Amino acid sequence: MTLSRSSADDSTNNANRSYSAVAGTDNKRKRDEDSSDYVGVAESLEMLKKQEIDADHMAASAQQTLISWRSGENSRSLSSSGECSSSNRPESTRLQIFVRMMSGGKTIVIHAEKYDTVEKLHQRIEWKTKIPALEQRVIYKGKQLQRENSLTYYSIEQDASLQLVARMQSTEHPVAWQTIDDIMYTISRMYKGENLQSNINEKIVTFFAMIPVESDESIAKYLNIFSNSSVPAALVMLYASSLERNKSCAKSSVKLFLSNCVALPKNQKNYCLPIVLEFCKLLRKVCPDQKLYVTCRNTLGSMLETFDNPHGVYNDQYETFGVEIFPFFTELTGLLLNELAQNSGPSFCDFQKVSSFWQQLRKVIELKVAFPIPIVLPMQSTALEAEIRHLHRLFGSLLTTMDLCMCRVESSLADKEVGNSETMSSSWSQYLSILKIINSMSNIYQGAKGQLAVMLNKNKVSFSALVVKFAKRGDDHQWIFEYKEATNFEARRHLAMLLFPDVKEDFEEMHEMLIDRSNLLSESFEYIVGASPEALHGGLFMEFKNEEATGPGVLREWFYLVCQEIFNPKNTLFLRSADDFRRFSPNPASKVDPLHPDFFEFTGRVIALALMHKVQVGVLFDRVFFLQLAGLKISLEDIKDTDRIMYNSCKQILEMDPEFFDSNAGLGLTFVLETEELGKRDTIELCPDGKLKAVNSKNRKQYVDLLIERRFATPILEQVKQFSRGFTDMLSHSVPPRSFFKRLYLEDLDGMLRGGENPISIDDWKAHTEYNGFKETDRQIDWFWKILKKMTEEEQRSILFFWTSNKFVPVEGFRGLSSKLYIYRLYEANDRLPLSHTCFYRLCIPRYPTITLMEQRLRLIAQDHVSSSFGKW
């Protein structure tokens, strides 16, 4: 009879199992971190609805089965003494219990006796779900069932619904567990249709308030309670409910959770990121078109911006992290492409979302892809293979779309009828940042960087315009210098100038200088070297002793005059280039002066300050000097304009027929350099035992390289170092010393220090001049321009200097000056000399009665000693 009873039990259980769903695997999957068995919430919701119906049928079927079984049982006599004690109890003690996993909406049916212990219930669940009993927690009406108590202790009745969740390995946070249990219980009741006054938000606030601060490990364990208890899935399930009150409650709770995450300190926020990512994945499957999903995705993006502990948070699952965020990056890139195609943006916020996902995705690729980067496509089987192929397609789409955008920019720049610049700027504002992401992508694929270079070179005008308009101080512009050839002078100058701090116009913070013209160099040295970099960043207030004039015009004059003194060969600091007297390089012999290091540091500061204040001082650097400032190697071609004789000799050595060269014993050359300094001749070995090492056709390239280095670089190494130190003092903090010069070509620096190479255009000068007290048609104005055209270029520059304290015109011409020029009528004697107010670019002349008298007066002030002393302010 016992055997017969057992068979009946088994058949009943088997029948019931045929209707029940398999549950309890999701939390175990989370503990095992096995994402491959993930079941989407959308599918789970459908399963849940079906299971509710199945459960009803199952309950009726089970009840009928039990009635039939009990009828048969009543007709039998139970004779076996080995039957379990429950067989002697009344049949009414038999319970049918529904056990549900909230994360997946799955339900199983368990049969038990009222007086069975909770431990027995755990064993039955283990038998059905394969989840170890020790890893289970069963919740009923918000309370966890303790294993030693009976089911009747908790008043569990027929068809009761219990909730199965995974037991955490640690019980360090019982209050947090209770808080989460309360949340899950409330969600369960609301989902069943109960109209409750929700306390979920209050519980979420409580949960966040208890996050530990002791260590990353304790933070991770604590926050895992939230995800391992399936709260994200439960809230999303509630949000997908057809009841508006449920949807509203879930929406409020999710948004509260997100805002609390964002407000956390960085280390705690890092460990919240996997939970936010889980919310995003769930919402994307259930409601991708609703605002809550967009809010969640945006929150994830903002958290990714500061996420810098991937290995601590994801351990060995970092590759999985990359796979999980890739769909969001793809989605956002698609939106970005659409906005670009429509010429409607994107906005900074839209771009920032794409950028934050890309930065993390790039790190994953660099760390996890087994192949060397750049990658050659197609690849063999590797991590992230599908994502890398898809990413390459996105790169192509972005490159093509930005090509079209750049063409539109160039067309707009050429179209004078285009709307105001602010409207244009709003639609172009993120183009440069998007190009930066495209460049970052191009580093991953072989040949991609060349494709980007072709596109930028093709769109040089628009690319340069974007750099000038949108490259801002403090941004990372280093990537642009990989495409230096795709930029023009204005773009490169703009990028270099961004390395300087803003010139402040606050008179209270200006560094004041009162200098005697007769002692210009030494007094200027004391004022500049004795000041801190911060004081000089605050601006300069310049005044010459016994003169009334002050202001920007006087400052421009001082810059010009002090640079003329510094680079005067009589002062032995610098030497003129043999082939171009406008160019200078440090004098190797200057080291005999004990003050020479300080004077080169002073020179570096003065040149940097002149560039900061956009004053053309009229000196040019020798190419060799410029290359050393940029930290670049000097080649043979670089000395062509520095020492033509040595250049020709070295070139002849390198181009000579190898057999002829060797047959003539390398012209008798050895690895030495003959020098003469301060009348003393010396022989310097270019390498160890250089006197004994003969030059031949195989080592002549090495000989020339060493010769150039020893002849041009080594002798002025200390001077270059001191100049760089002074120059770097004037740059913004944390800017590498050589970065300014690396951003430029030598010709760019020429334009910044001396202005345009072309002769002054009188027509351009006239076009940028306005009149006060005169009309353009007055004969005095006509005479003025005729006289100016007759003057030599040096006389014209002297007039310009008297007028503006600028002796050189910017590369762009007169439009490059900070203001238009003005001719004012002087209401005094009609034969007096002109006056000027250099700060305001204002020239004052009387109404001269004859052209001859005007020419006399203008030629008088065109003399250097006059043009430097007649201006007022």
UniProtKB/Swiss-Prot annotation:
GO terms for cellular component: cytoplasm. Its main location: cytoplasm. Residues 532-873 form the HECT domain. One of its GO terms (molecular function) is carbohydrate binding. Residues 1-19 have a biased composition (Polar residues). SMART domains: HECTc (SM00119), UBQ (SM00213). Pfam families: HECT, ubiquitin. It is an enzyme of class 2 (transferase). Its EC number is 2.3.2.26. Disruption phenotype: Accelerated senescence. Induction: By jasmonate. Down-regulated by hydrogen peroxide. It comes from the Eukaryota. Disulfide bonds: none annotated. Pathway: Protein modification; protein ubiquitination. Residues 95-171 form the Ubiquitin-like domain. Keywords: Cytoplasm, Lectin, Transferase, Ubl conjugation pathway. It is found in: Cytoplasm. It catalyses: S-ubiquitinyl-[E2 ubiquitin-conjugating enzyme]-L-cysteine + [acceptor protein]-L-lysine = [E2 ubiquitin-conjugating enzyme]-L-cysteine + N(6)-ubiquitinyl-[acceptor protein]-L-lysine. Residues 1-37, 70-90 are annotated as: Disordered. Residues 272-296 form the C-type lectin domain. The active site is at C839 (glycyl thioester intermediate). Belongs to the UPL family. E3 ubiquitin protein ligase that regulates leaf senescence through ubiquitination and subsequent degradation of WRKY53. Interacts with WRKY53. This is E3 ubiquitin-protein ligase UPL5. It comes from Arabidopsis thaliana. The lineage of its organism: Eukaryota, Viridiplantae, Streptophyta, Embryophyta, Tracheophyta.
